[in-house]
């Protein structure tokens, strides 16, 4: 007998791992009911992942579930929010119980890893896609937005850039992971780390923040447009991993870093006088952050300008991923 929607949910997704006092009503009713702490605001984000647009048909259900969760939590991290709850809308072409079992176990394990509770969702038949709505909370009026960059701010990025795009390139070419560099790059694509603790550490010192989902050029451009300013970025300051430099030349590595996307690192700005405070806060975290440029007065459009050793250079490759432009 074919498994129905409610049987599927009950068997695979109603295995609540966490006991969460903030959840008064969860899976099994028309809505979930949750409580937000006093003097905090609710932060909400939604992302959809569609097969052949956001992920390859060859991705494992374990990696797909992890990445679907992590990319949503990354949005909350950029706001400085504490992730708390998610709902899942899962569209499946058919009911493959082995696939669903593996996917659900990975999803619930990932949620437990980040202390997040699944509180509801929906399933339907169609081409494979995953939509997750993630919710969290941030102290009232303390959320880090995109529109408050100030002239003179220093621009920082976390960890290293371009690894995900380099890993995806290897996967698209059918390259097996034959050494530690390959493993590192491919895992950076399949298993990004949402910088939740970093986002919270930036509250009170960062003017703006964004997670790098579409590439540095594109995502920094969002900050510049919302903040009505321009920026200079020093290419020699871009943090590149030893793995990407072992596998690609510097020019290709920079291209991955600037326009590859899906690094899910944080890009943020702080006023220069908070530089020491930032370094102090970073000592408590295992996440290096690198200053790559500064915010300037608006000049021309909102695309960042690039320097190499302090001298202006032109960037000729793509600015980043855009769902609709890429489909034309």
Curated annotation (Swiss-Prot):
Short name of any one Pfam family annotated for the protein: AIRS_C
Binding site for Mg(2+) 4: 30, 45, 75
UniProt: Mg(2+) 3 binding residues: 30, 75, 211
Binding annotation for substrate: 54, 262, 321
Gene3D superfamilies: PurM-like C-terminal domain, PurM-like, N-terminal domain
Keywords per UniProt: ATP-binding, Kinase, Magnesium, Metal-binding, Nucleotide-binding, Thiamine biosynthesis, Transferase
Residues binding Mg(2+) 2, per UniProt: 47, 75
Enzyme Commission number(s) from the entry: 2.7.4.16
Sites where the protein binds Mg(2+) 5: 214
A single BP term in Gene Ontology: thiamine diphosphate biosynthetic process
Chain positions recorded as ATP binding sites: 121-122, 146, 213
Known pathway: Cofactor biosynthesis; thiamine diphosphate biosynthesis; thiamine diphosphate from thiamine phosphate: step 1/1
GO molecular function: ATP binding; magnesium ion binding; thiamine-phosphate kinase activity
Reaction catalyzed: thiamine phosphate + ATP = thiamine diphosphate + ADP
Positions annotated to bind Mg(2+) 1: 46-47, 122
Coiled coil: none
Function description: Catalyzes the ATP-dependent phosphorylation of thiamine-monophosphate (TMP) to form thiamine-pyrophosphate (TPP), the active form of vitamin B1.
Similarity-based family: Belongs to the thiamine-monophosphate kinase family.
NCBIfam families, per database record: thiL
Further comment found in the protein's record: Reaction mechanism of ThiL seems to utilize a direct, inline transfer of the gamma-phosphate of ATP to TMP rather than a phosphorylated enzyme intermediate.
PANTHER family referenced in this protein's UniProt entry, alphabetically: THIAMINE-MONOPHOSPHATE KINASE
Name of the protein this chain belongs to: Thiamine-monophosphate kinase
Organism encoding this protein: Haemophilus influenzae (strain ATCC 51907 / DSM 11121 / KW20 / Rd)
UniProt lineage: Bacteria, Pseudomonadati, Pseudomonadota, Gammaproteobacteria, Pasteurellales
């Amino acid at each position: 007998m074919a498994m129905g929607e409610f049987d599927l949910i009950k068997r695979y997704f109603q295995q609540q791992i966490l006991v969460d006092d903030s959840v008064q009503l969860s899976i099994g009713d028309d809505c979930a009911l949750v409580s937000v702490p006093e003097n905090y605001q609710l932060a909400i984000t939604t992302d959809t992942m569609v097969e052949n647009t956001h992920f390859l048909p060859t991705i494992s259900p374990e990696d797909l579930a992890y990445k679907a969760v992590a990319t949503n939590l990354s949005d909350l991290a950029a706001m400085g929010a504490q992730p708390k709850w998610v709902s899942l809308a899962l569209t499946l072409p058919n009911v493959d119980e082995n696939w669903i079992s593996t996917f659900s176990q990975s999803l619930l394990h990932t949620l437990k890893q980040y202390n997040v509770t699944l509180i509801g969702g929906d399933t339907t038949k169609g081409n494979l896609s995953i939509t997750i709505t993630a919710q969290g909370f941030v102290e009232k009026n303390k959320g880090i937005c995109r529109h408050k960059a100030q002239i003179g701010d220093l621009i920082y990025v976390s960890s290293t850039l371009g690894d995900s795009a380099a890993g995806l390139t290897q996967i698209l070419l059918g390259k097996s992971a034959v050494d530690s560099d390959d493993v590192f790059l491919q895992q950076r694509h399949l298993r990004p780390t949402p910088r939740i603790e970093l986002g919270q550490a930036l509250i009170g010192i960062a003017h703006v923040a964004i997670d790098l989902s579409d590439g540095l050029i594109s995502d920094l451009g969002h900050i510049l447009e919302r903040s009505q300013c321009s920026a200079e970025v020093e290419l020699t300051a871009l943090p590149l991993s030893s793995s990407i430099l072992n596998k690609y030349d510097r020019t290709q590595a920079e291209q991955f870093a600037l326009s590859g996307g899906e690094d899910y690192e944080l890009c943020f700005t702080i006023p220069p006088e908070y530089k020491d405070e930032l370094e102090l806060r970073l000592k408590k975290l295992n996440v290096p952050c690198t200053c790559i440029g500064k915010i300037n007065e608006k000049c021309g459009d909102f695309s960042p300008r690039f320097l190499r050793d302090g001298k202006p250079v032109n960037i000729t490759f793509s600015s980043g991923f855009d769902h609709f432009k890429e489909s034309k």
